[in-house]
Amino acid sequence: MKDAYIIDAIRTPIGRYGGVLSPVRADDLGAVPMRALMERNSSVDWSQVDDLFYGCANQAGEDNRNVARMSALLAGLPVQVPGTTLNRLCGSGMDAIGNAARTIKAGEAGLMIAGGVESMSRAPFVMGKAEKAYSRSAEIHDTTIGWRFVNRQMKTQFGIDSMPETAENVAEQFNISREDQDAFALRSQQRTAAAMQAGRLAEEIVPVEVPRRKQEPLVVDTDEHPRASTTLEQLAKLPTPFREGGSVTAGNASGVNDGACALLLASPEQAERFALKPRARVVGMATAGVEPRIMGFGPAPASRKVLAQTGLTLEQMDVIELNEAFAAQALAVTRDLGLPDDAEHVNPNGGAIALGHPLGMSGARLVTTALHELERRQGRYALCTMCIGVGQGIALIIERL
């Protein structure tokens, strides 16, 4: 099979729910990093892009009707470039990269764009149609996150625990204490604050211009979600609203956020044709299923699966980017893999607890951050992994070139 090279990777800043990026539609937001790829790689004939895969978890609002294609057109890509939207919930952006790489490895494409977008701020309310005439039983659902239009059999067989409730389940099953969760959350905030102060995250960010009425556009070039002043004492005072006597709080969980990320992938032939310098190659990707009630544990079997498929070991990973949906599940996964709670190479620049978790974008963000970190420390391999709602995990390995 051919190699699938990562040529470039760029993302927008991550905005808070209702924050600086909330005025930007998902399709417009998704276009921003695509446009940046085009500007940064001017030697490419963009009409030669074979396909574009973009992850998006919602697709109930302005991100409907194939947001990947919409964003591609808005970015100025030639109309000949097709695009499709992938939905593996939280793993969508990573799945897009892995499937783009597989397409190149199979020889079916030579040039691909992959990534993801999510505007959780702009997620709409939806209402289903009544099952019979004159019914008064219509329900309105907030599509920002979680279950809607639940299948009764799913509820009976697997439960419909909310995402925080699944984290409570993980904390209980794997004996993850509130104190350990808060300590993990604090480390995430501290590492992100240090990375931002050193300018490390700025290297992977393209600014977003947010239109303003009767004013110049607001230029957003910094992640909005981190709270650098967080203390352990503050975290300890937060309530546990998801379960009586529980341990999951707003402080040791990821945020509800907005953002977009895009990567350019190429075969060896197309990289040479357009004078592109490969930065990494996608070694492999794997997915795994777990019980929906403990969905946060998904990265553990997915990571083992991709390591087995690629013939690599966890000890060979110079960087590990583990999505911090919740501190409870991140700790359950790292401990199951035999890693210390404060492993220096696991989320060295912090993670989703500090940075935020725009669902369809996050997987692509992990790969982008891992690539930049590998280059900084001159490492070889990075493992990127994350949990997925309804009980899945996904993991992807890249090798720096």
Regions found by a protein language model. Give the residues of each.
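Conserved active-site "lid/cap" helical segment
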Residues: 1-71, 75, 82, 166-178, ...
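Condensing-enzyme catalytic core mediating Claisen C-C bond formation in acyl metabolism
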Residues: 1-24, 145, 230-297, 301, ...
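N-terminal extracellular/periplasmic Venus flytrap/periplasmic-binding protein-like
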Residues: 11-12, 23, 27-32, 43, ...
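Conserved catalytic cysteine-centered active-site region
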Residues: 24, 56-111, 144-147, 157-163, ...
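Active-site pocket-lining segment
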Residues: 54, 168, 204, 212-214, ...
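Active-site-proximal alpha-helical scaffold in enzymes
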Residues: 87-118, 171-200, 262-269, 335, ...
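Flexible glycine-/small-residue-enriched beta->alpha junction loops
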Residues: 111-169
